[in-house]
Structure formats: C-alpha cells, structure tokens
C-alpha cells in the first residue's frame, strides 16, 4: 500500500486499507459504525471534525484509536477559560536554577509528526484561542520562535460542552464553517452493546483497548496524496451536479422551494449560510464515500449520506428559531430530501 502505483490499483489498495482501518477502530469503540465511517471520510477528505455527544460516550477513546491506526502523533488539550493562545504553542516555567524555561506546547511538541489534535471542550476557551486554532486548521502552519512550523498531516478534532453554559464561549458561525463535519456520537442503543460496555472489563481499560488497535494501518504521511487522487478519480454526471445545486437551493431558500414545516414561517427561517465552500466540502466528502463504496462515480446516496453532517451546522437560522435548532434543522433536511427529486 505504501508504494504508490498509478491508476486504479493504487486506490484499490488504499480502499482495502481504509476498510481494515475501520475494522481496527471498531475494536476500541462499540456501536459507533456510522461515526467511524464519517471519520474515515473526513480523514480522506482532509477535513477537520467537530464531535458532538454527551460526556462518556467514547469520543476520546475513538480519537485515540484513530490516531493509533493513522500513525503519527496524538495531542489533546482541555479548553479552559484562562487558556491563552500561546498555551497551544509553548509554555514557560522556572527551572531548578531559578531561570525561566520555554518548552514547545502541544501543537509544536511533535511538529510535522502530529496527525491528530483533539481540543476537548473547545467552547470553554476564549475567542482569542479559537482564532489561533482556526488559523492552524486553515493553513496547517504557525509561526513561532522566528521560524514557521508546518503540519502537513494535521487533522483537528474538537468537541463542545453542551450541558454547562457558564464560562463558555460558543464558536461563531464562521468558525464552525471551518469544520468539514459535525458528527454526533450517542451511547449505543443495541442492548448487547450496552451490556458489553457496562459489564465487560475489556472496555473499562481504555489504554489497553487502544493498544489492541493495529498501529499505522494507514500511512498518515501519504494520505494527502491519496486524498487528491480520490477527488480526481470520482466523476459526477450532470444530473448529479444539478441534484447537488437543487439541494443547496432548497436548503437556503426553503420557502420558494415549496418546503413547509408546521408552525414556522419558511420565508424567514434561514438567515444565511451554506456557502459555496460548504457545498464544495459536501462534494468532496461524497466523493470519498463513493470511493469507499467501490465506485468511481457519484450517486445520490453518496450526497445524502454525508449531507446532514456537512451542511447542518452551516445553516444559520433567524434568532427566533435558533433555540429550536436541534429539532428544526433535521426536519428541514428531511424535507429538502423529500422535495428535491433524486436523478
């Protein structure tokens, strides 16, 4: 797999490796097949991810398993109200001799080897910290100590504290748009999986659980090259292009599209969002999904499979409806699918 070969053989090798990667990750987390598939899509689409879910559903375990399967370095930081932007880059302390010392922070500690960076409870950090993180996400580089550091293989994952609202700073819409996906994680609903998580001691030791994942299933240093090859290999027929544009139009202008939701003024519902960048992200993710399914062309199901996670957080509602966002946006997306005919 690590020796790149031209054409379909190379992508077939990597698709087989991606399937093995998913199987390895599933050893560490139970009942999260959809989240694993979406994370795999994000990895090969070279996009950053916001994880949504309650405390204790396995977000950290999942990301540690992903980092091990990818190879490269894993770093995690906890968002706090007193965090400064520089805390991501370096930290200072007094040495035993009383002199100040400066050491690299979590972003620089492993530099080019950093493949997974997890920002836990990102909304506890202040906007200044968000700004630096977003720059690192966009440019995969940062300037410090009179030089520029590059992170060509970096993938940023973050999650938000959805329960406690004191001393939190919600990311503005423009910041959330930088994330390719927002992926929800819930406790498994399957009774067997629930019993295993509670009663099987194997799932109580996350360190050992993570070690069961085969290391370096994917060569993280080559994913950028493969990601580009995937985008060029997967074609979209004119009918699919028209379908994507139709979904986009109906999402941002649901009233004129004939969509109706009970008790909602559809002409006032959507304030903005769903930019061309967001729709380009949608197609990028859909192409990866098609590749994982063994096709070199897009079908409507590729678009629909990633649409909620890629587009939902990019829709900005009127303030009067924002408090009901968790209910309204899924209903809106379902109505969009029902209204826009698939080719």
From Swiss-Prot:
List, in alphabetical order, the Gene Ontology terms for molecular function in this entry.
ATP binding; ATP hydrolysis activity
An annotated GO cellular component? cytoplasm
According to its UniProt record, where is this protein located? Cytoplasm
Q: Which family does it belong to?
A: Belongs to the MoxR family.
Name the UniProt key words of this record, in alphabetical order: ATP-binding, Cytoplasm, Methanol utilization, Nucleotide-binding
Source lineage = Bacteria, Pseudomonadati, Pseudomonadota, Alphaproteobacteria, Hyphomicrobiales
Q: Which Pfam families match?
A: AAA_3, AAA_lid_2
| Gene giving rise to this polypeptide | moxR
Q: How is this protein named in the record?
A: Protein MoxR
Q: Which InterPro entries match?
A: AAA+_ATPase (IPR003593), ATPase_AAA-3 (IPR011703), CbbQ/NirQ/NorQ/GpvN (IPR050764), ChlI/MoxR_AAA_lid (IPR041628), ClpA/B (IPR001270), P-loop_NTPase (IPR027417)
What this chain does, per the record? May be involved in the regulation of formation of active methanol dehydrogenase.
What species is this protein from? Methylorubrum extorquens (strain ATCC 14718 / DSM 1338 / JCM 2805 / NCIMB 9133 / AM1) (Methylobacterium extorquens)
Task: Extract one GO BP annotation from the record.
Answer: methanol metabolic process
Q: Which residues bind ATP?
A: 53-60
